Amino acid sequence: MAFVLCSCQKEERMYVSLDDFATLRTSRYDISADRVFSNIRTLILSDKSNSLADMHARKHYNTSMEMLWITRGDVSSKADTLLSYISRVDSLGFSRDKFYYSLLKEDLQRVRTLDFDSIKTADNSAVKVFARLEYYLTKAFLRYTEGQRFGFMNPYKAFNRLDQRKDDTLHVTYRSLYGWHTSLPNDTYLATACAVIKGDMDNFADFLAKSKPHNPLYAKYISALNKTRDKDYRRRLLCNIERCRWE
């Protein structure tokens, strides 16, 4: 004979809401998009650089405030690909610090080890670290890709403001010394670059690789640059390398 024991009371169902996890929240890791954007605005206000790449970075965040690198609670793996390119800019005659290499590497490490300051106003609080990564990754990406593709120096500005006219006593004008048609990065390029950052990894890596000049002399000059320590010769090589970027 079998006995079945049952309760006359109805089964009580348990519902779990987000509020039930509130006690598990750690303020050190508490971030929001609004607070990240607020810190990006602070970085923009203190950024006085007048390079075209940096102005493009500021323009993106001033107009759309769209996150390009930060995913849900992490940073895109494309950041590592970008850093691998920046780590080799010394072979092009540049300092890594011009592309924020040390800052970005350190902040990426902080994110991946959750090494944040507990005080929200501290320099290395989670919000400030994510804001720095978002802003300076974009600046580094545009500095590298725009510089490699179009040149790190604008030849129109560099050469057409040297020879001041003496016959114009009312206005400051200059004789044009550079008139060769040369492409410059515009808003269309900026939109393309931002879309590449948001896109898939293959296109991102391909975009970086194809940013370098197509001039066949470029590779020869780079090779020569890395074989000599003569300052005057290196200076001439760097000038010719830059000319290869003006297309």
Predicted regions and their residues:
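C-terminal motif of bacterial Sec signal peptides marking the signal peptidase cleavage site
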Residues: 4-7
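Auxiliary tRNA-acceptor-end handling modules of aminoacyl-tRNA synthetases
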Residues: 9-247
